[in-house]
């Protein structure tokens, strides 16, 4: 809503985009080649155990690779609606956060993530590995590493490695597009975990 008002007040008009060409490129990339590699991508609320259930009860996952919303990022779904639409999501933006991880406090946020990790653990093989890309946003007074470590405690996963993954590059930070003073992106981390 803010961005739309900003453009209208200034009489700005976006450059024309051939939406069908964008869709065609995506379709060719997604459906143009097949691979012997198998895997599953889920678009669901992973706090719900049934969201992660495999096709058959005996199937177990070997890898979980994820990047959950960062603490305080309440507009995660609306900000990603176009990407979501390309993979089958709704064709309109829904400005609500009712189906998102709780952001009321760092403790509540970590507890919600812990439920996700427990649900993932319950459908993984004994030697499964999980990799989490996690960071923070600058206006939150919570340490991303403390949050992710807290979320993984008593979750069925044990942290084996934490690596700095750098920061989001300035050119890719949509939050800075209309700001006079650019914010400094926080360091992101790759957290590796295994089942104990």
Model-derived segments and their meaning:
Residues 20-23, 113-115, 145:
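Well-ordered, non-membrane alpha-helical segments in soluble/globular domains
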Residues 48-51, 71-75, 138-142, 168-173:
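Flexible loop/turn segments at secondary-structure boundaries
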Residues 141, 145, 149, 156-196:
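Class I S-adenosyl-L-methionine
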Residues 23-39, 116-128, 155:
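A structural motif corresponding to the C-terminal end of an alpha-helix
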Residues 63-64, 85-89, 152-155, 183-184:
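Short, surface-exposed linear patches
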Residues 1-66, 71-72:
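SAM-dependent nucleic-acid methyltransferase catalytic core
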Residues 51-63, 69-129:
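SAM-dependent methyltransferase catalytic-core segment centered on the flexible catalytic loop
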């Amino acid at each position: 809503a803010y961005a739309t008002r900003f453009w209208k007040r200034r009489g700005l008009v976006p450059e024309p985009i051939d939406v069908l060409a964008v869709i065609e490129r995506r379709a060719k990339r997604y459906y143009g080649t097949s691979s012997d590699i198998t895997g599953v991508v889920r678009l669901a609320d992973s706090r719900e155990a049934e969201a992660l259930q495999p096709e058959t009860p005996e199937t177990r996952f070997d890898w979980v690779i994820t990047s959950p919303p960062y603490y305080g990022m309440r507009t995660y779904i609306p900000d990603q609606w176009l990407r979501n639409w390309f993979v089958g999501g709704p064709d309109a933006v829904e400005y609500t956060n009712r189906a998102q991880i709780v952001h009321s406090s760092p403790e509540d946020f970590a507890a919600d993530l812990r439920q996700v990790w427990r649900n993932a653990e319950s459908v993984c093989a004994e030697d499964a590995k999980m990799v989490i890309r996690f960071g923070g946003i600058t206006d939150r007074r919570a340490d991303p590493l403390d949050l992710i470590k807290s979320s993984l405690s008593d979750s069925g996963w044990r942290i084996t490695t934490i690596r700095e993954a750098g920061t989001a590059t300035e050119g890719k930070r949509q939050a800075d597009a209309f700001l006079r003073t650019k914010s400094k992106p926080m360091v992101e981390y790759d957290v590796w975990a295994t089942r104990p």
